[in-house]
Each structure stands twice: as C-alpha cells, then as structure tokens.
Amino acid sequence: MDAFYASVEARDDPALRGKPLIIGALPHERGVVATCNYEARKYGVHSAMNIREAFRLCPTGVYMHPNFDKYRAVSRRLREIWSDYASALETVALDEAYLDVTQKALSWENACAFAREIKRRTLEELRLTCSVGVAYSKTAAKTASEEKKPDGYFEIRTPRDFVSLIEDRDAGVLYTVGEKTREKLKRAGILTVRDIRDRPEEVVRLLGRQGEWITRVAFGEDDRAVTPYRPEDAKSVSRELTFQKDVEDRGFLKDVLLLLSLSVERRAARYGLYGEGVTLKVTWGDMKSLTRSGTVPSTRSAAVIWQETGRLLDTLPSRPVRLIGAGLHYLGGENGRQVSFDDILPENAYLRDRAVQEGLDRMQARYGLDFKANLDRIFHGETLYKTVEYMRKHR
C-alpha cells in the first residue's frame, strides 16, 4: 500500500488531503514517525525518523497518533481481496504481502491481469491506492512494487530483467542490505549491485553467510516460496514502551514491567505459545540500548516474566530510563512443551498468580486506577501507553 496509515486518515478526513501528514508521535512528545504521506516526504521526513527532527524539517505538517484499530480493520479487508487471487499469502505487514498466484493464474498474462484487478478493487472498495509488482521471485516482486510508487504497477519477468534494472544502483537497493551492511560494503569499495556481481568472493569473505545470500540476490536468484505466516513460527513475543520523560524510579519501572508482562502473556496465549527465555530491554536517556536475558522453565506466565525481568533490572545500574520492554523467546507450542513444576505442583502457579494480583492491588493504591477491572481496556490500542503516562505523572 502507499503510505498506508496516512492514506487511510486522508481518505476518512478530506481536510487532510494535499497536506503533509505525519503519523506517529506528536511534536512535543518522544517518539518516531510511523509513516508519512508523499507531501511530507518532499520535506525530507521519513519513517523511523525522530519526531522532533521531522518537526524541524516540516513544522507546517499535520501530526497525528496512529489509530491501529482502524488500520487493522482495513488490513482485514485487504487480505480478503488478496485471498481471492492467491493460493498462498505471506503477510509482511498490515499493508503488505507476497501473493503466489501461480496455481490460480496459470499464465504470466493472467497474473498481470490479477494484479490490475487487485489495484482496481482496492481503489473501488477501499478508496485507497496500492503499488503492485509482478515478478518471478519474492525479491524481484518487492523491487517491482517499489519501482513506480505511488499507485504503481511494474513487471519483472526474468532474472536478466531484474539484474538489468538494478545492477548500476546502490547496493542498498537490495532488500537484504541494511544500512550497517551497506557501510561495510562501502568501506571495501563495493558500492553498487554491479560491484557485488564483480566481486562475489570478497562479499562472502566480508559478510559470511549473509554475503552468500546477497550475492545470490545480486544475480537475480531467489527460490524462496511464499509461506503463509504461522504464529507458532514466531521467535519471540514482546512489548515495550517509551516514556515522555526519563524515569529512574525502580518501583515505577517494575510496575510497568508487570503490565508489559501481562500483555506478553496475552499475546503468547492467543497463539498457544510458550517460551523458555525472558528478555528485558532498556534504553537509557542517552539513547544507548541493552538487552538482558534469562532462562526459565517453559512458560507464558506473566508472573514468571515479571519476576525475571525485575531480577534482570536489578542487575543494571540506576540510570534514567527512556524505554523499557519485556519479552518471551525460545518459543514453542503445547506439543513440544516439557512438563514444568507448575504442572506437577499447581500451587506454585497459584502463588505466582497471587503475586500478580497483589502487585495490581499495590498499583491501584499507588496510582488510583482499578487495574484488575480494566485490564482488557488497558491492553487495547494506545490505552497502555496512556495508562503508563498517567502512572508516571501521578506516582
């Protein structure tokens, strides 16, 4: 989709059309740009940019918080349209997916007709534009979809066509080459895709297995199948929050970790996942980040996540914190899960759950909020962020 969040907002509010629109944090808040429309990009604003830098570049822009409930609803309709044409659908984001239309289209011409039909239906049914790439591989299709944005359509039929299109472009045009990898290549004098093709052994020596893949892509090779996302294949489940002002209060940070742990528990339970590792993420006030991990018996218990992240936090120096996060990793489903002490001794789980309930009671007394009665609402949309900001101001 083209500037998805911003396009949805402009569709629903005609007054926003033609104006630079930045979705993310507000200018006086901490945060980044989630997305922006093409009018804002003319000022140099882009996704992931610090919001204050965006405001410096585009002070006349319209700044809005994202409305994820609205975007998810549109995303569901998009998937319904896509599913009419694809035998396999691999969702990359709310607004982006790979579609394997081979079995339904049966010919290149029909595949191209499907692409145009998807564009037509997206415009007529959702009043949104999209850019579609038709190609022989996932990498080529992604490249094609970016070629004529916005409202674009482009075809790359063969590896030779792909190479001819990109070989004189910056190496960063390859979607497997991030900024750090690009800098490594640049220091070695490898600037373009053609350079990668001319010096494949050097790229492999420099980057190892990643270099092998990048070299293959530079030659137009990509045999990856379109694979529908399966939650059980996820490597981690996590939740994090950025504070509007740095926080050093350990009691408050542990209260936030309890809410984050409950959120992680809910996400893991939704997909039937358990984890054997807990991760704490912290970003200090100077923007330096670190993660700490601990091993736990197979669990998705908020109590276990809370206890372990609290323990990990206690190992860190007391410094102003800008962001804090909790996560569960080494994931697996019920079938591969080993029996834990909670299965053998249910009273252990009960005692830990009681610790969570007592923690919520203490938080109610401290902040004046009924957390137990409002957990469903707290974890909905942006409410968790707003709740934590209220807690920070009223502690």
Give the ranges of each region predicted by the language model.
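Non-catalytic, largely sequence-independent nucleic-acid-binding elements associated
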Residues: H329-E334, R395
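DNA-contacting surface of Y-family translesion DNA polymerases
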Residues: V173, T181-L323, G333-G336
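Gly/Gly-Pro- and Ser/Thr-rich, intrinsically disordered tail segments characteristic of DNA damage-repair
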Residues: M1-R216, V226, R266, E347-R395
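Short, charged/polar, Gly/Pro-enriched secondary-structure boundary elements
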Residues: A105-E109, G332-V339
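Short, contiguous acidic/charged loop-to-helix segments that flank catalytic cores in large enzymes
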Residues: T295-R300, L345-L351
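Glycine-rich beta-alpha junction loops
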Residues: Y136, W284, Y330
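Short, hydrophobic beta-strand segments
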Residues: A97-Q103, S289-G294, V339-L345
